[in-house]
């Protein structure tokens, strides 16, 4: 039996779930409780600390049960490519399928990770928004160093477009065109593009 405790005057605090067990009461923050149900949240900017936590949670859930799906809920404006790629590589590396769900928005690296979910298990809620574009970068310094970084960004752009083509089924030429500038999509448009497999208005029975 679970009870959700939340003080509405302290909205910055994470809600705590109190569970009644045979050994007495146990308390979990809401995210830890959902982790027991194999649910991981990717909320906010994609950066190293967040990525490390998500990778650790996926590895833990794999060790708990390598044959049961992991559910990754995404509401993110994007962020660091290298941090995002650590999540992506782990999703592909572990044995359980990772089902992805966009709630709110999945932009840039958020959209990339959304479409990286297991085939047939990539979803969005009806009013979610998705945005794809080319990687952003900025660097100051000597001209030779700027040139090195520009070449690196072009390599990353090619790598991301190639992976997006693999997961969406879009031709690489079309992806290069579509990611040249910010490209916003509704949930239905993201489904048509191949970023997700279905738009869910209600939880499947």
Swiss-Prot record:
MF GO annotations: ATP-dependent peptidase activity; ATPase binding; serine-type endopeptidase activity
Catalytic activity, as annotated: Hydrolysis of proteins to small peptides in the presence of ATP and magnesium. alpha-casein is the usual test substrate. In the absence of ATP, only oligopeptides shorter than five residues are hydrolyzed (such as succinyl-Leu-Tyr-|-NHMec, and Leu-Tyr-Leu-|-Tyr-Trp, in which cleavage of the -Tyr-|-Leu- and -Tyr-|-Trp bonds also occurs)
Family note: Belongs to the peptidase S14 family.
GO cellular component: cytoplasm; endopeptidase Clp complex
Entry keywords, A to Z: Cytoplasm, Hydrolase, Protease, Serine protease
Subcellular localization(s) per the UniProt record: Cytoplasm
Quaternary structure note: Fourteen ClpP subunits assemble into 2 heptameric rings which stack back to back to give a disk-like structure with a central cavity, resembling the structure of eukaryotic proteasomes.
Species of the source: Alcanivorax borkumensis (strain ATCC 700651 / DSM 11573 / NCIMB 13689 / SK2)
Gene name tied to this protein: clpP
Single biological process term from Gene Ontology: protein quality control for misfolded or incompletely synthesized proteins
Keyword Transcription: no
InterPro entries xrefs: ClpP (IPR001907), ClpP/crotonase-like_dom_sf (IPR029045), ClpP/TepA (IPR023562), ClpP_His_AS (IPR033135), ClpP_Ser_AS (IPR018215)
Domain of life: Bacteria
UniProt cross-references to Pfam families, sorted A to Z: CLP_protease
Enzyme kind, highest EC tier: hydrolase
Record flagged with keyword Cytoplasm: yes
EC number(s) stated in the UniProt entry for this protein: 3.4.21.92
Cited NCBIfam families: clpP, PRK00277.1, PRK12553.1
Function: Cleaves peptides in various proteins in a process that requires ATP hydrolysis. Has a chymotrypsin-like activity. Plays a major role in the degradation of misfolded proteins.
Catalytic site positions: 108, 133
Protein name: ATP-dependent Clp protease proteolytic subunit
